[in-house]
Amino acid sequence: MKRLWLVLVIFCFGKSQTTTVNMGGGEMVLIPGGTFEMGRPDGKSGYDNFPVHLVKIDSFYMDKFEITVGEFKQFLNETGYDFDWGLWEIFFVSPLDDHPMVHVNWYEATAFAEWTGKRLPTEAEWEYAARGELKGKRYPWGNIITKNDANFHKYWKDDDEYGQSHSVKNNGKDKWKYSTAPVGSFEPNRYGLYDMAGNVAEWCQDWYQHDYYKVSPMDNPKGPETGIEKVSRGGHWYSWHKGLRVYNRGGNPPDVKWFQDVQGFRCALDVK
């Protein structure tokens, strides 16, 4: 297992003071515990992110960035882990070491996390961290999304009172039309986390269950005991803008790779 080591740095993002530590070879952010409303505020019965419910989260650490190709290569080189590179998928979508690793199934992401002494975040931890102390907002920064905010595919014309409209891919900072962007290419949220919307979707610990919010406990929920798919959050470089919303849920089979040119991950760690 990779040795954990810690260097403490304090930053300020917006109104939040952020504590960053270097652990397991990568930067992590201390996410202070608290209570939040999880789910879609305008959701309806039958939606997988309905009903909105109160959730209490203990403090934890979360990776500042998505795990990169370079970091995953180091894991493979040091452990000899048997990994299928997926021919063109990784190199076409994430061509350089500073891009997020893709084509990783849930078990491979878990193996990497365990090697670093960490774990995957729970779904509740992920949404709490993505919101970055903002209440009732759609994205980690607010209710409006532009090409200066994240790496994603496109808008649709049929949106809502916020006036989102169609946009070509190359308007704004997002210049990556059919690939990931280097991690940290866009502004962080208030916790100092980068790419919590777009770039790559991120694995969570939990099994996915469509109606789990109806039975979820309040304190540190960890998802159902069993399932067929694992939770994937955050949207990705080929998502339309609604897929990037902090409350948007999804699930994918944990052991297959056919969809995973858009799938990555980041790690979490308990506060001890």
Predicted feature residues:
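Short, structured beta-strand segments at or near domain termini in extracellular proteins/domains
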Residues: 259-272
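A short glycine-rich, aromatic-capped structural motif
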Residues: 21-86, 104-107, 198
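Short, P/G- and charge-enriched loop/turn segments at secondary-structure junctions
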Residues: 17-18, 43-52, 169, 250-256
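Non-catalytic surface loops within mature trypsin-like serine protease
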Residues: 40, 59, 68, 143, ...
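Bacterial Sec-dependent signal peptides at the C-terminal "C-region" and cleavage site
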Residues: 11-19
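Functional-site microenvironments in short loops/helix caps that host divalent-cation chemistry
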Residues: 37, 41-42, 82, 87-253, ...
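Sec-dependent N-terminal signal peptides
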Residues: 4-12
